[in-house]
């Protein structure tokens, strides 16, 4: 099954984000996530990981994981064909063209020449609220939590341009997640893959988001700091259906 079909199929899925630059013992976190019932692993997010390191990290994870392992690259240097796919990110609300199209031009050439078997999902990355490190590094102008209408406008633009996915990102360690009302509004206008992440620290927060029917809910900081709570989050997502 193609990765995009897996993401679209069935109920809301939970993915665990592994940042190998932050997580020395990333396999321990992966095992916690697998035991909790996670549906997939995202790998990336850092600026300090090279291709050779990423290749080894993905190999290590795939040696223990029975779920898809997908790249979430912080730069074009974080590509490897060992993964099952890549979220080919364009930060739509960045103020720097590099993060909208510059890095993507570099990454596209690398994929075409060196990683042609890697499944690519074009992803409109939209920074919301606090934005966290992702918003700072990408020089974004985050969408305020209360302005769901702006999120809808970006989602519509992503749809008409032809993106295969929209990722609403509140940022690593954000004080609160993307509001459920914003997810609901975007879901109504974007029928493709919808991903939500950032600031999700409890089962109840995950349950409220899952009720709005995104395709994927991502937790990263929680996995790093309190991996024992992953089971609570996954149960909440599954029980919301």
Curated annotation (Swiss-Prot):
The protein's annotated pathway: Membrane lipid metabolism; glycerophospholipid metabolism
Regions annotated as coiled coil: none
Keyword NADP included in the entry's annotation: no
Primary localization: cytoplasm
Keyword Magnesium: yes
Binding site for sn-glycerol 1-phosphate: 167-173, 198-199, 220-221
Enzyme category, top tier: transferase
The entry's keywords: Cytoplasm, Lipid biosynthesis, Lipid metabolism, Magnesium, Metal-binding, Phospholipid biosynthesis, Phospholipid metabolism, Transferase
Known catalytic reactions: sn-glycerol 1-phosphate + (2E,6E,10E)-geranylgeranyl diphosphate = sn-3-O-(geranylgeranyl)glycerol 1-phosphate + diphosphate
Residues annotated to bind Mg(2+): 19, 46
EC code: 2.5.1.41
GO molecular function terms noted in the UniProt entry: magnesium ion binding; phosphoglycerol geranylgeranyltransferase activity
One of the GO biological process terms: glycerophospholipid biosynthetic process
InterPro entries per the UniProt record, alphabetical: GGGP/HepGP_synthase_I (IPR039074), GGGP/HepGP_synthase_sf (IPR038597), GGGP_HepGP_synthase (IPR008205), GGGP_synth (IPR010946)
Pfam families xrefs: PcrB
Domain of life of the organism encoding this protein: Archaea
Cofactor(s) listed: Mg(2+)
A GO CC annotation given for this chain: cytoplasm
PANTHER family per the UniProt record, alphabetical: HEPTAPRENYLGLYCERYL PHOSPHATE SYNTHASE (PTHR40029:SF2), PTHR40029
Family statement: Belongs to the GGGP/HepGP synthase family. Group II subfamily.
Protein name: Geranylgeranylglyceryl phosphate synthase
Organism: Pyrobaculum calidifontis (strain DSM 21063 / JCM 11548 / VA1)
